[in-house]
Amino acid sequence: MTELKAKGPRAPHVAGGPPSPEVGSPLLCRPAAGPYPGSQTSDTLPEVSAIPISLDGLLFPRPCQGQDPSDEKTQDQQSLSDVEGAYSRAEATRGAGGSSSSPPEKDSGLLDSVLETLLAPSGPGQSQPSPPACEVTSSWCLFGPELPEDPPAAPATQGVLSPLMSRSGGKAGDSSGTAAAHKVLPRGLSPSRQLLLPVSGSPHWSGAPVKPSPQPAAVEVEEEDGSESEESAGPLLKGKPRALGGAAAGGGAAAVPPGAAAGGVALVPKEDSRFSAPRVALVEQDAPMAPGRSPLATTVMDFIHVPILPLNHALLAARTRQLLEDESYDGGAGAASAFAPPRSSPSASSTPVAVGDFPDCAYPPDAEPKDDAYPLYSDFQPPALKIKEEEEGAEASARSPRSYLVAGANPAAFPDFPLGPPPPLPPRAPPSRPGEAAVTAAPASASVSSASSSGSTLECILYKAEGAPPQQGPFAPPPCKAPGASGCLLPRDGLPSTSASAAAAGAAPALYPALGLNGLPQLGYQAAVLKEGLPQVYPPYLNYLRPDSEASQSPQYSFESLPQKICLICGDEASGCHYGVLTCGSCKVFFKRAMEGQHNYLCAGRNDCIVDKIRRKNCPACRLRKCCQAGMVLGGRKFKKFNKVRVVRALDAVALPQPVGIPNESQALSQRFTFSPGQDIQLIPPLINLLMSIEPDVIYAGHDNTKPDTSSSLLTSLNQLGERQLLSVVKWSKSLPGFRNLHIDDQITLIQYSWMSLMVFGLGWRSYKHVSGQMLYFAPDLILNEQRMKESSFYSLCLTMWQIPQEFVKLQVSQEEFLCMKVLLLLNTIPLEGLRSQTQFEEMRSSYIRELIKAIGLRQKGVVSSSQRFYQLTKLLDNLHDLVKQLHLYCLNTFIQSRALSVEFPEMMSEVIAAQLPKILAGMVKPLLFHKK
């Protein structure tokens, strides 16, 4: 073990015993208690292997050549309060006199002695003594006044910053074990306590040699409550808790001091809850006493107070290895994290523990500081770890002090909010986070400006307070930055982010891909997928599918952007995009009349007649077939508003491979659909199969059918049923693929606007399936036949609701069609100003329109009948707007008169009615219609 130069014999001190008599008591008027030979210099001190030193031996100066022994005794007898006052006077002297050459002799010797003991690690073969304090040409800087205040003296700061964290390997000093013990001392621990366990049987004198322990032992330093810790700690301990191991522990042995690795004792200090919150250091509190101090002094000096972070040793080791092996840290100004020692440090060459690659989020030397966004792989870590860059080289003087990187939020500063997905920020590649694994950054030091501190704190709270996306499970995150990139490009936001800025910067895929609930991918058919999946039968239509980036630039169809101006049906000059396809006016009118008139055209030939400008009127059957094959649908004109979907093909959609991979439950059904005019489609699409699996269970109203019906009892039972169905709608919508990708406010708005439509639509489906539309099947325990309807006070309302199951009976709606129509009902009303995530909403709605087309194609054999079917079903959805408006009006009137009518309204239902129904009835919402009235 590296040998240590002893400072001189001291009074014995036993670990756990009372404090040393030399500490904590004023000794100005009495001689020294123990022998302290003044003639003995540091060059002739005996060598020992290790000594159990506490901080009571760190506050006394080393003798210097040419210094009077009386001065030594005077310094030796200074109390801690006198030492602190000396520091303050030195600061005031420095601030008043500008940049002097050196501090007063007494203070200089004291500071040098303390720093020689505190901050001087040693290598394996370094045993030469340190030069005396009086021979040191440049004074050490610990408390701030010694920092240069004028720009010409700025390079001297660079020489100061590096030794503060880790001295160079050529500097002689104490043994690595003792130096590490000095650095590890946490705040609040009394300097009179023993930090190293003495070997049993060995004397506790500072001059006695101690044999190194064969195995490193972990010592838990418990901080006890009491004033003695606070008073005896001295100014050296007034700050934040120190980081475990200091700079010496960052080299490869992660969190284990070199002394412990060589057989010493590793300190594992316990965190005290009293000191978990960030506190202002003594240097910052005394800032007004030194008006001449530069702001760099205040900013940099708090960087020795690194709080204790109980991280995993393997994590620290792997993090250190990555910092040491990264090429970006070997060149330039050498900006290193607090975990990375200087290149000259002997600990930098030690072998780290290989655990795997971790994201490298340290900012480059020539870039602005970026937020630390890599996630923590353990539980919530209360203390904040501040990583301050160690600046080397001439470029450090030209750069302003950087703020800290925070690897964990402090619970005392930030409350525990559920992590959420904030919207992406354009200037910096963005957490939804969603989730609890996301780490937000905020300043943890009082040296950071108040404006940036408050902004970061507000940003952290906003990011946590927003709605969280579905939990993604313990997925391993991708690398934080691309190879060769020096900046952290990981998006902060937990939401699916496909921003162009992150892609242009070369960032890796986002930590959280665009997923819906239960890990389902986000719905949406990209133009490239559509082009690849189109069958070879329709090559002319490939030119009309524009990429998303081009489509998002223009909100509507641009006639000039299309490659040609001919009708896709007959080849005549096109007049515009009609019903989703570029056609002429003649084919537009023909298609509208053919679909709305419900004509059954028959071809006299073999269904392969030529349709051109001259012969387009010869065979209406082939002309209509060609219109449907081109993708014309009566609701196609509404798709002009959608940015992502430009061409909707009614029957080609079933010919495309599924871009949405449904995991697990639908793998057997995720087959590619092919379509030909004479082939039937029998397989159920995976998404429709998923909609079947998330259908809510049967809900009961709790109505007592043994008692005679009264108006108040029926309405109260219906309200109780409505409350339960509203909760069911919320649960169902969360499981709906694509719905959780919307903003949380948009999700709430859509549910509040459409809950009545969903309830009455479900009522119609149950009445159609269970009683063939002859009665109103509200619930298994609440079925109203026509007689009970007449006896109720809302008979006219029952007749209005009865129209829906009768339409189901007339159209013979299938379950697949009902499920797709139900989702479209959820998406059929939006605010007048639009939604926050309008693009995702339009993409989701367009996807479910295509699913409805697929559901229609499961039963309809011809293209003509399929298009007619689509028109009939979408017309039913449009008619529901007027029907539901009557229900809204009756519900609001009943709610207003609920006390007079003795009708009870549940709490959640009351909130929705009071907040949204007046807005809906006042026309402050925008219904989305498939057809013009």
UniProtKB/Swiss-Prot annotation:
- Post-translational modification (record): Phosphorylated on multiple serine sites. Several of these sites are hormone-dependent. Phosphorylation on Ser-294 is highly hormone-dependent and modulates ubiquitination and sumoylation on Lys-388. Phosphorylation on Ser-102 and Ser-345 also requires induction by hormone. Basal phosphorylation on Ser-81, Ser-162, Ser-190 and Ser-400 is increased in response to progesterone and can be phosphorylated in vitro by the CDK2-A1 complex. Increased levels of phosphorylation on Ser-400 also in the presence of EGF, heregulin, IGF, PMA and FBS. Sumoylation is hormone-dependent and represses transcriptional activity. Sumoylation on all three sites is enhanced by PIAS3. Desumoylated by SENP1. Sumoylation on Lys-388, the main site of sumoylation, is repressed by ubiquitination on the same site, and modulated by phosphorylation at Ser-294.
Q: Name one GO cellular component term.
A: chromatin
Give positions of region: Modulating, Pro-Rich: 1-566
Which residue windows does the record flag with biased composition (Pro residues)?
A: 418-433
Residues with the Phosphoserine modification: 20, 81, 130, 162, 190, 213, 294, 345, 400, 676
Q: Write down the DNA-binding region ranges.
A: 567-639
NR C4-type zinc finger segments: 567-587, 603-627
Any coiled-coil regions, as ranges: none
The molecular function GO annotations come to: ATPase binding; DNA-binding transcription activator activity, RNA polymerase II-specific; estrogen response element binding; identical protein binding; nuclear receptor activity; nuclear steroid receptor activity; steroid binding; transcription coactivator binding
Listed SMART domains: HOLI, ZnF_C4
For the cross-link Glycyl lysine isopeptide (Lys-Gly) (interchain with G-Cter in ubiquitin), the position is 388
Residues reported in the UniProt entry to bind progesterone: 766
Q: Where is this region: AF3?
A: 1-164
Where's it found, cell-wise? Nucleus; Cytoplasm
Composition bias of kind Low complexity appears in 232-246, 335-350, 434-452
Compositional bias of type Acidic residues: which residue ranges?
Answer: 220-231
Q: Could you tell me which residues belong to the region AF2?
A: 687-933
Name the Pfam families for this protein.
Answer: Hormone_recep, Prog_receptor, zf-C4
Q: What family does the entry list?
A: Belongs to the nuclear hormone receptor family.
What the protein does?
The steroid hormones and their receptors are involved in the regulation of eukaryotic gene expression and affect cellular proliferation and differentiation in target tissues. Transcriptional activator of several progesteron-dependent promoters in a variety of cell types. Involved in activation of SRC-dependent MAPK signaling on hormone stimulation.
Name of the protein in its database record = Progesterone receptor
What species was this sequence derived from?
Answer: Gorilla gorilla gorilla (Western lowland gorilla)
